[in-house]
Amino acid sequence: MANHKSSLKRIRQEETRRLHNRYYGKTMRNAVRKLRATTDKKEAVAMYPGITKMLDKLAKTNVIHKNKANNLKSKLALYINKLA
């Protein structure tokens, strides 16, 4: 167990950040799954900007790597273009 006040505070902060990152990571994964499950192109096109915004924010705050965000955006764009 930590002995210093600052290390106790650090432990509290890390736990808060971990829960925050888990929540937004899970939310992002669910949004991507929902888009991939969509077969309607209009609906997918409407969802895409919100998901890209979410991916960019998570990459900026280091919840996910920036390359992962870019790869997901690229693959989702390809998926949307393939929809008829």
UniProtKB/Swiss-Prot annotation:
Gene3D superfamilies documented for this protein: Ribosomal protein S20
SUPFAM superfamilies assigned to the protein according to its UniProt record, in alphabetical order: Ribosomal protein S20
GO cellular component: cytosol; small ribosomal subunit
Keyword Membrane: no
GO biological process terms, semicolon-separated: translation
Organism, as annotated: Bacteroides thetaiotaomicron (strain ATCC 29148 / DSM 2079 / JCM 5827 / CCUG 10774 / NCTC 10582 / VPI-5482 / E50)
Keyword Metal-binding recorded: no
Protein name according to UniProt: Small ribosomal subunit protein bS20
InterPro entries, sorted: Ribosomal_bS20, Ribosomal_bS20_sf
GO molecular function terms listed in the Swiss-Prot or TrEMBL record: small ribosomal subunit rRNA binding; structural constituent of ribosome
